[in-house]
Design a protein with these regions (language model features):
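Iron-sulfur cluster-binding electron-transfer modules in prokaryotic oxidoreductases
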Residues: 17, 30, 146-474
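Ferredoxin-type iron-sulfur electron-transfer modules in oxidoreductases and energy-metabolism complexes
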Residues: 2-39, 43-179, 297-303, 351, ...
Length: 474
């Protein structure tokens, strides 16, 4: 005899029943997570598909967009029932000071007592996200984990202290211009085994990249590249503006991969263009990834003002790194301070219009591994590299590939190192190894973090497509 009671079909609780208990304003504010319908497209086993790298690297459901959205909904329900404000975290200096006592208490004295609200479990799930935005581009209902991840991290760290690692990453764009004044000293420190061990064990960072050490002021002067300003741009005639381009610098290619920067200048100049470079301002992407949202909004406001003054001349603005450049189109547009940010083109979007055609037979084959954010969010733009190469008699193919496992600073965090390596071995590793075989086309990568990961994992430096194109105009 069984004592089990049969459940009525219409008596089984549904997800919608608990979702209705969440405050309507909260529901609408976190719509990208609330609208996850559980289709499971993110449970993708294909290693050569971009979504979702953390799921493929761990095979843990909490490390998938569906898992994170489900955890967030449950967390929001618990916060609603507890009367907590999840729409706005305390901000500003006063907010930081006011919450300091409670953050100290929660972090050191009563941390385990609050485990029932899922905060720590959700934090662990969010920490495993690469913020590659593949879900934002490929999920059928456009669940964007990086968006609600950043908001959660801001709220979480209004209750708990941040690790030093977060401040180091968030301040990178602001500190690197100063550090670049002493490249030899910086590189010596970052190469020292004791310093590396200290960074690993105490800060939680590994394999810090080294500065290029190029004297950019001298290089720009030698190439006759001016600093872009409204005055300099307005001084150009209408015809001169048609042959002018302004490069928007990002911290990574500017100081850590300067050869790509210089290659762009040379390519533009040799194809008859006048090149100017915008004054450097932090882009803010690392701040957004770590949940420093007030600081990100300030950075977006400053950068947007600069870009608007430069774009008023009608001269195209171009950014080299896909992940950093697409921030202007995506994260900036979602905050009031950057909602009217002008378009900054990816290099291939500008080159397909501006690069002169060379009448020559096919003189080489190449393969491009595109950045995850770029190929999942702007696939049409990514495909433009092929006609750009055709213009100069080169054949470019884009093999299907997954994620490289670096994703900005994700792969440089010690807690993510093993997952980062596992992701690389699934897709990029075999493709890179195959490219080293005789008669194989040269492999290229347009993402700075992707090139950094290949160098770290396989000991190879992949060239940027710009560097290949420059050879055709040497």
């Amino acid at each position: 005899k069984l004592d089990a009671e049969l459940l009525k079909v219409d008596g089984v609780p549904l997800r919608a029943d608990s979702d209705r208990m969440i405050n309507e304003r909260v529901w609408e504010s976190y719509g990208t997570a609330m609208h996850c319908n559980g289709n499971g497209a993110c449970y993708n086993f294909d290693p050569n598909d971009a979504m979702c790298p953390s799921w493929k690297g761990t095979r843990e459901r909490r490390h998938s967009p569906k898992g994170r959205a489900s955890l967030l909904r449950e967390w929001l329900l618990l916060q609603t029932q507890a009367g907590a404000d999840v729409l706005q975290a305390p901000r500003g200096v006063w907010g930081f000071v006011k919450t300091l006592p409670s953050r100290l208490k929660n972090s050191f004295l009563t941390r385990n007592e609050s485990a029932g609200d899922l905060s720590h479990e959700l934090y662990e799930a969010m920490s495993g996200c690469l913020s590659c935005k593949a879900c934002a581009g490929q999920c059928p209902v456009k669940v964007s984990v990086p968006d609600f991840r950043a908001r959660f991290l801001e709220l979480y760290h209004a209750r708990y202290l941040r690790p030093m690692r977060d401040y180091l990453i968030g301040s990178l764009e602001f500190s690197v211009p100063f550090l670049s004044r002493f490249p030899a000293v910086y590189n010596a420190l970052m190469s020292n085994s004791r310093i590396k061990e200290l960074l690993h064990s105490r800060i939680g960072m590994v394999d810090s990249p080294l500065l290029s050490g190029t004297d950019m002021e001298h290089a720009l002067k030698k190439l006759d590249v001016q600093i872009a300003s409204p005055k300099a741009l307005n001084a150009l005639s209408k015809e001169q503006r048609k042959r002018c381009v302004v490069l928007i610098p990002d911290a990574f290619t500017r100081w850590f991969d300067t050869s790509v920067w210089i290659a762009f200048f040379k390519l533009a100049i040799r194809t008859g263009h006048t090149v100017m470079v915008a004054p450097y301002l932090p882009n803010g992407k690392p701040l957004h990834v770590q949940g420093f949202l007030p600081a990100f909004e300030k950075a977006a406001a400053r950068q947007s003002v600069l870009l608007k003054t430069l774009s008023a001349s009608g001269v195209p603005l171009v950014g080299l790194d896909p992940a950093m450049t697409l921030v202007f189109r995506q994260e900036y547009r979602k905050v009031s301070s950057g909602s009217d940010c002008p378009e900054v083109m990816l290099p291939q979007e500008w080159l397909v219009q501006s690069l002169p055609k060379i009448d020559t037979a096919n003189q080489g084959q190449f393969q491009l591994l595109a950045h995850c954010t770029e190929k999942t969010n702007t696939p049409t733009s990514t495909a433009l590299w092929e006609p750009v190469f055709e213009k100069v008699g080169l054949q470019l193919n884009m093999p299907v590939s997954g994620c490289c496992g670096m994703a900005g600073t994700y792969g440089h965090e010690a807690r993510n190192m093993e997952t980062s390596k596992a992701i690389y071995r699934q897709s990029w590793g075999p493709l890179v190894e195959q490219s080293t075989q005789e008669q194989s086309p040269e492999l290229l990568a347009d993402g700075y973090s992707c090139r950094c990961q290949v160098d770290r994992m396989s000991g190879l430096r992949l060239r940027h497509p710009i560097e290949v194109l420059l050879e055709k105009f040497s």
